[in-house]
Amino acid sequence: MKTEQLMTFLISPEQTIVEAMQKIDANAKGILFITNTDRKLIGAITDGDIRRWLIKTGNLQEQISRLMNRNPKSVYRREVASAQDVMRRYSITALPVLNSKGIVIDILFEQEQKTEVREGSLSLDKVPVVIMAGGKGTRLYPYTKILPKPLIPIGDIPIMERIIDKFRDVGVTDFYATVNYRKNMIKSYFTDTAKDYEIKYVEENQPLGTAGSLRLIEEDFEQPFIVTNCDILIHADYEDIYRYHRESGNELTIVSALKNIVVPYGVIHSSENGAVQSMEEKPKLSYFVNTGMYILNPELKKEIPEDTFYHMTDLTDKLLKENRKVGMYPISEDSFLDMGEFEEMHRMEKKLDLKSE
């Protein structure tokens, strides 16, 4: 591994959670190794460690030294032949290689020929997925004057088909689509495309918001179900998201993404009497935002009012006012792709390494 590539996996203990999330996005392996100024190994941190920390504290500015594993596994250069055995023995996917002075000189990764199901894996083959596909997509005019938003192509594949393909990768076969605007075009496309899954259509007679059409689903779900907007892609472990929802005891789980926003001006901090206390040049603010993907307990469907314009925010507010458990599952900024606007659509194509037509 070249030094430049190696450095994408190394981070200092003083750096923050936000910085670690950005580095993990960049290396796309879900792990970082913490080193001191001499590049000696002192710890490791995974995206799972960060997610658990954020769920517990929500603190993005804490130093990663607070939550790193201080006893990471490693091998010396002379022991490289045993690396795969070490990774299997300890159920880890990455292993740093050290020289005789304890300096990280390489990172080895789990061989990818393994196909067996990991212990603790969770099948989603019986989990219903509801795709909210009834909106007009006004932010994507003039495209959506011709095509409904779910059929807008990202590359050469409609966004809704890409969403379905992501869920098919984890075994989902039970899909529902709430439709309204140009619904016959959507139904025709998926009818004419030979697929190994079924889509049940739920037809709105009027706009019902981001949650109202869930009440129109006649089936009584026996387990928590997934709801997703039709204009987003989430690159995350769907099985882990679902497992977190069940194990945490949430009634509603909101998949949330880190969003870094740079204010394009100098920000003035002042006292109550208008005296300037400090000025910050183009500060970067970090927030967790709603991605538009949720996991709901089945009984919530009946709590949505009939024939009423009702947003998912309305349902969330209702649960919180009743002191019921609503949780979030945090993901990184680059794990959330949104095509709701032209700029974001082109970003999605670039992220997926697709060429815009």
Regions found by a protein language model. Give the residues of each.
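Short acidic/polar active-site loop segments enriched in Thr and Asp
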Residues: G30, T93, T173, Q223, ...
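Active-site metal-binding loops of divalent metal-dependent hydrolases
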Residues: K136, C230-I232
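N-terminal glycine-rich phosphate-binding loop and ensuing alpha1 helix
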Residues: S121-I186
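Bateman/CBS regulatory modules and CBS-like beta-alpha motifs in cytosolic regions of diverse proteins
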Residues: M1-K23, N27-K29, I34-T37, L41-I42, ...
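Catalytic-core segments of class I nucleotidyltransferases/pyrophosphorylases
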Residues: F225-I226, L233, E239-R246, K259-V262, ...
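Conserved N-terminal catalytic core of the sugar/cofactor nucleotidyltransferase
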Residues: I55, I157-N229, D240, S270, ...
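A short, polar/charged loop-to-alpha-helix boundary motif
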Residues: D49-S65, E112-K126, F288
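A short, conserved acidic/glycine-rich loop-to-beta-strand motif
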Residues: S248-L258
